[in-house]
Design a protein with these regions (language model features):
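Intein modules and their embedded homing endonuclease domains
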Residues: 10-198
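Repeat-associated, polar segments at repeat-unit boundaries in modular proteins
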Residues: 1-13
C-alpha cells in the first residue's frame, strides 16, 4: 500500500537524489551538504561553525570542513557508481565505452532515440562527477561552506538557552524531574557544554 502512494520514495533511492545538487553551484552544493548534515552542523555569528559530536555542539571549523570532505566522499562514490551504470547501459545499447567517453557531434548524430537518452544520462552523471571533483578542492569547499552558513544559522542566544537541561556524557537531564528527567542527547537542544561524569 505505502509503495503505491503518491510521493513514495523507495529505500534504495532515498537520499540518492539529495546528493546531487539542483544546480551545480556553490549554493547547490551547500544545500546538499546541509540536507545530509543538518543535525550535525550549525553556525552562529558569535561562534562561527559548530559540529555536533554526538554529545554536544563544539566550535570547530575543522570538524565542519571534515564533514564537507565526508560529504564529497559519498558524492564521489555515488557519481562513480552512476557513471559506471550509465556506461554499462550504453554498452548494452551497442555503444562502445570509449566512443561514449570521447563523444563529439558526429557521435551524437549517429545515436538513435534510446541511445541518445542513455548518452544524456551518462553526460549528466559525468558532469556531476566533475562537479564533485571540483568541490574536493579546498578553495571550492570553502565557498560551499560559506554558502551554507545562512542555511544553518542560529541565534547565539539559542545555544545553551535552557538552564534546566544538564548535559552529561550519558544523556541529558531535565533538572526539575531529577533522575527521571533523563533523555538521550538531542542536537536540537543546542547544548555546547557537557559534564565530565554521567
Amino acid at each position: 500500500k505505502v509503495a503505491k502512494q503518491e510521493g513514495y520514495v523507495a529505500p534504495e533511492a532515498y537520499g540518492k537524489q539529495s546528493l546531487i545538487p539542483d544546480d551545480f553551484s556553490d549554493v547547490g552544493e551547500a544545500r546538499t551538504f546541509v540536507e545530509q548534515y543538518a543535525d550535525e552542523v550549525a553556525f552562529t555569528v558569535a561562534t562561527d561553525y559548530l559540529r555536533y559530536n554526538g554529545t554536544y555542539w563544539e566550535e570547530s571549523e575543522h570538524a565542519v570542513t571534515l564533514a564537507m570532505m565526508e560529504h564529497t566522499d559519498v558524492q564521489l562514490a555515488e557519481a562513480e557508481k552512476q557513471v559506471e551504470a550509465a556506461l554499462q547501459n550504453l554498452e548494452h545499447l551497442g555503444i562502445p565505452r570509449e566512443a561514449a567517453k570521447t563523444g563529439g557531434k558526429k557521435f551524437r548524430d549517429s545515436l538513435d532515440e534510446a541511445q541518445t537518452a542513455a548518452y544524456q544520462q551518462y553526460q549528466y552523471y559525468s558532469t556531476f562527477q566533475a562537479f564533485v571533483m571540483k568541490y574536493r578542492n579546498v578553495r571550492n569547499m570553502t565557498n560551499a561552506l560559506d554558502a551554507a552558513k545562512p542555511i544553518v544559522l542560529h541565534n547565539p542566544e539559542a545555544l545553551d538557552s535552557n538552564p534546566m537541561l544538564l548535559n552529561t556524557p550519558g544523556g541529558t537531564y531535565y533538572l526539575p524531574e531529577g533522575l527521571n528527567g533523563w533523555k538521550p542527547t538531542d542536537p536540537a537542544d543546542l547544548l555546547t557544554k557537557v559534564t565530565t561524569v554521567v
